[in-house]
Amino acid sequence: MSMGRSPSTTFRSRTGSHGARDLIAGHGRNSRRISQMHVNILHPQLQTMVEQWQMRERPSLETENGKGSLLLENEGVADIITMCPFGEVISVVFPWFLANVRTSLEIKLSDFKHQLFELIAPMKWGTYSVKPQDYVFRQLNNFGEIEVIFNDDQPLSKLELHGTFPMLFLYQPDGINRDKELMSDISHCLGYSLDKLEESLDEELRQFRASLWARTKKTCLTRGLEGTSHYAFPEEQYLCVGESCPKDLESKVKAAKLSYQMFWRKRKAEINGVCEKMMKIQIEFNPNETPKSLLHTFLYEMRKLDVYDTDDPADEGWFLQLAGRTTFVTNPDVKLTSYDGVRSELESYRCPGFVVRRQSLVLKDYCRPKPLYEPHYVRAHERKLALDVLSVSIDSTPKQSKNSDMVMTDFRPTASLKQVSLWDLDANLMIRPVNISGFDFPADVDMYVRIEFSVYVGTLTLASKSTTKVNAQFAKWNKEMYTFDLYMKDMPPSAVLSIRVLYGKVKLKSEEFEVGWVNMSLTDWRDELRQGQFLFHLWAPEPTANRSRIGENGARIGTNAAVTIEISSYGGRVRMPSQGQYTYLVKHRSTWTETLNIMGDDYESCIRDPGYKKLQMLVKKHESGIVLEEDEQRHVWMWRRYIQKQEPDLLIVLSELAFVWTDRENFSELYVMLEKWKPPSVAAALTLLGKRCTDRVIRKFAVEKLNEQLSPVTFHLFILPLIQALKYEPRAQSEVGMMLLTRALCDYRIGHRLFWLLRAEIARLRDCDLKSEEYRRISLLMEAYLRGNEEHIKIITRQVDMVDELTRISTLVKGMPKDVATMKLRDELRSISHKMENMDSPLDPVYKLGEMIIDKAIVLGSAKRPLMLHWKNKNPKSDLHLPFCAMIFKNGDDLRQDMLVLQVLEVMDNIWKAANIDCCLNPYAVLPMGEMIGIIEVVPNCKTIFEIQVGTGFMNTAVRSIDPSFMNKWIRKQCGIEDEKKKSKKDSTKNPIEKKIDNTQAMKKYFESVDRFLYSCVGYSVATYIMGIKDRHSDNLMLTEDGKYFHIDFGHILGHGKTKLGIQRDRQPFILTEHFMTVIRSGKSVDGNSHELQKFKTLCVEAYEVMWNNRDLFVSLFTLMLGMELPELSTKADLDHLKKTLFCNGESKEEARKFFAGIYEEAFNGSWSTKTNWLFHAVKHY
């Protein structure tokens, strides 16, 4: 196509040319016309647009492929583009030409636009986009105003197109380039085009997307934007405001003579990032020190030394940054020992280091973000709501201006539409099966197919029906409706229809086979009853499938089978009752027999009531899985007021009583009672967000209470289970998703972790072109987060690019020998390492990746050829904490189970620390970043037990496996304590005083290491027993040089261990060998009655008791994690193993302590078995 640049250039055909004025005035031979002589008769507004259009830059119509006649006749008048042979003619003005289009007026504007751009593809011009999503329509309305048409969902017949001059104008809205760039960046971060995602959105998901934007906009206006309250300001996590320093820690610090190390540099050095030659001041440890008081002491010492910088302004403020990390301690009400980073250093016998930073320089990195750009789909949604006459916006405020957020939450239509309430219906639920499609039944004439229907709420089945058996080759039913024993007035608003399709042989009483299953809510996203005929795509009957998932298999994953059913219609829209109707019913109902219940105001009188013991007995019976009889359910229901005020966690029990959900009066009262319900525990709230509760009212209540209880310090521990809770949501718009979005926008670190965990989720769902409902929901949540945090997009983009490059390299080196692969890795890194430097670590943004150390990059020897990479830690004084950031990149392993175990370990660590027990756990970071792709933090200065075992030869390795003191000897060596022969040679050159000082320091270091080993052994013994971690051998047990013991590689959990000849290899409850006990006893032989081992046993029992007190929380966490569909966490038996190790049937702390004391004795007496396994492992792998 040749291009014309002059404003006077006209469209040209092969036989002649006419000006733009003629083109606008003429509509072709078959079109309606206005005067071709004068355009001045048009409306003045339109005349202005015509004149502006005439002055555009435009091309000629001479096309290389000869298709120019598509738009112009030989006479120079535009041909009609035919979309529909019997439609109306509409003129569409593009930025660079005009086209006349014959189309049906019933076509949606979005479809019209997409088809039009496909037809005019030969007319594309380089300076203009030919993507339909980059344009919106404008028209001249009845008031003579130029109006933008943002709602693409309406048909052309709804537009104000004048019969004498039907014309539409296409234009690119203001800011379209920024929107395009933003969409492109977000698409890159997601790994999937937003344009394609938009095309796949149905009406519910478009509403969800607009709601997410409204929440994003509201949150961004209210979150911290300045100073230390800035949403990205990295305050170090702390345990509890006002908490005193534990006495044990205080004694440990004083014995080790620890102090605070303060580092200061001049302003110019800080600006340039120079960390060498920093001034150091040591300040004596004070258990009551706060950041404010420590700074005050430091500045006082500086004045005494007469040290200052003339470049600093007189009013300069100061921050304390933890050495080696981008985290600060600034809260004046929090003691330093309550900060996690400070306490960990003290517990490890290390002096906490602080870099004193200038506030003015630090806060430059946390400036106010630029205003949000309102995306085009929001304006489209506002217009749609206005045209649909829907009344309430997302934030329940009336529309103030055309720029406000009109996004719907109250989905009820206006009175002009025919509608009734569910409570107006006087009928039972009726459903008709229609047919089964998309499934190839076995070619056997005797095959039948049938459907099982059930209506449920949570774990309760309210009604069920099984259809007649029909011939599988036809798989069609007659027009008979099946009537369910479910009165419509009593149908709960969150009732779910479960459909299961089965087939088998007619003449044989053999096992039936499952075609598939699907669960669908009986109400739609508008909160209206589903009516009419529906086609639902079934889920394949996979063994690990999440059968609680609500929604169809829209992506056709695993099967193309579908079922068509018809739900009885009532001649109009049927809406669910509102909260006001529930309240009215409860207040004015005429039957009061069940309202005379235990009120619960006086706790003492309640527990003395004879019915209380029966209540406790029934609760235990229910929790054991036994279904309560109706009279027993009534007894529990009579105690609802007591439960509301005294035992709010029993809401779980009430929500699982069939008695509640089969009568609208009962669940209406429960809804009303929730308004004044005492907050349940975190464990109970998480349980209510799992598969046991599908009711949206109760789930909303649980989210609200969870949001109140989880502080910013602890919220990150629950991101993973809350993501799984999303999978149990019946609708796209959920309170769980909104809470995750809000928290992520208000805390950069939460947002960073949420993004990567969500990206790993959608990576597993990216295996087909038709994206699943779950994929689209999560993608929209991620998009909303990135739109609200544009600054994070730049960081995420670099990290995504890093993952892509490492994936490419790991694939490249997979088939190579280890040494050759390492050389190839380093060659590749030399050309791209600059792309992976000077950025936040994907594992934890508090660490800054500096220069990559290419010579330390290696390919590990395992089958998947993981890559081990090292960077310099760019944070100041990183030598005190973590000089290098090392990580392993894995391509081909599913890291989700490891991440689950380590997340639970982090929760345990947090709970133990809150109970003043520091078990020195090392929950290193693991981050899945895609399908079978992820990175693992490398813990520095450590070795596996096997590496410690390996000596100078085969026999030496075998002997060390048997030698109970080899671990203790290794620890002594790391502390500088040599064996007697080596020691005598070295000491011969030193005087006696030097010898004594060196020996004292080495022994002090050794005993500190033994103490670390003791507490870490306590933590991992209890944790691995509770989680049933198996396949423990000397290659996945590690020891740091300072004595910390920890586990890696969690391939087998919840009792799933390796077996040989049907016998499990790991027969001990947890690892406790003679080698460990020798270290605990500081090298002395094992004696179970010794003070050291009795102390170890006591600590183990105390640590277990703390976990037992929180048993409900762990059961809730693992129950939610069923949504991950891991092979070893997928069944009730897996959860039963956890309940067994947590001694959930125990009724008292004494019983729990006695239970674990028995477990300890079993591990102690069976230590020889583990020792033998280690010997065979060493011999096999040497």
UniProtKB/Swiss-Prot annotation:
GO terms for cellular component: cytoplasm; non-motile cilium; phosphatidylinositol 3-kinase complex; plasma membrane. Residues 1047-1073 are annotated as: Activation loop. CDD domains: C2_PI3K_like (cd08380), PI3Ka (cd00864). Residues 1028-1036 are annotated as: Catalytic loop. It catalyses: a 1,2-diacyl-sn-glycero-3-phospho-(1D-myo-inositol) + ATP = a 1,2-diacyl-sn-glycero-3-phospho-(1D-myo-inositol-3-phosphate) + ADP + H(+). Residues 1-16 have a biased composition (Polar residues). Keywords: ATP-binding, Kinase, Nucleotide-binding, Transferase. Its EC number is 2.7.1.137. Changing residue 761 to L: In am88; extends lifespan, increases pharyngeal pumping, and causes faster body movements. Also increases dauer formation. Residues 853-1168 form the PI3K/PI4K catalytic domain. One of its GO terms (biological process) is regulation of synaptic assembly at neuromuscular junction. Residues 266-358 form the PI3K-RBD domain. Pfam families: PI3_PI4_kinase (PF00454), PI3K_C2 (PF00792), PI3K_p85B (PF02192), PI3K_rbd (PF00794), PI3Ka (PF00613). Residues 1-24 are annotated as: Disordered. Belongs to the PI3/PI4-kinase family. Phosphatidylinositol 3-kinase homolog that regulates longevity and diapause. Promotes cell survival during embryonic development by recruiting akt-1/2 to the plasma membrane through the production of PtdIns(3,4,5)P3. Could function in the development or neuroendocrine signaling of the dauer pathway. Mediates susceptibility to enteropathogenic E.coli infection. May negatively regulate AYI interneuron neurite outgrowth. Plays a role in aversive olfactory learning when an odor is associated with food deprivation. This is Phosphatidylinositol 3-kinase age-1. It comes from Caenorhabditis elegans.
